[in-house]
Amino acid sequence: MVQNDFVDSYDVTMLLQDDDGKQYYEYHKGLSLSDFEVLYGNTADEIIKLRLDKVL
């Protein structure tokens, strides 16, 4: 059996701010890095904080 040490699964927490200054959180569980790239690219509001946690 071959062991794969590359884990491509992350929980993402983002603090966003809209054009009116309202801040809100979004949570996304179990995203691959490719999914995160799409999410990041499609986020219209400003990202204030970003946290990626590797799923073990």
Swiss-Prot record:
Does Methyltransferase count among this protein's keywords? Answer: no
Sorted alphabetically, the Gene Ontology BP terms of this entry are: biological process involved in interaction with host
Arranged from A to Z, the UniProt key words for this protein are: Early protein, Host-virus interaction
Cell inner membrane keyword on record: no
Pfam families membership: UDG-inhib_P56
Instruction: Tell me which InterPro entries the record gives.
Output: P56, UDG_Inhib_phi29likevirus
Q: What does this protein do?
A: Inhibits the host uracil-DNA glycosylase (UDG), an enzyme which removes uracil residues from DNA by the base excision repair. Interacts with host uracil-DNA glycosylase and prevents the latter from binding to DNA. Since the viral DNA polymerase efficiently incorporates dUMP into DNA, the virus needs to prevent the deleterious effect caused by host UDG when it eliminates uracil residues present in the viral genome.
Q: Which family does it belong to?
A: Belongs to the phi29likevirus protein p56 family.
- How does this polypeptide assemble, per the annotation? Homodimer. Interacts with host UDG; this interaction inhibits the uracil-DNA glycosylase.
Its name, as the record gives it, is Protein p56
Name the lineage: Viruses, Duplodnaviria, Heunggongvirae, Uroviricota, Caudoviricetes
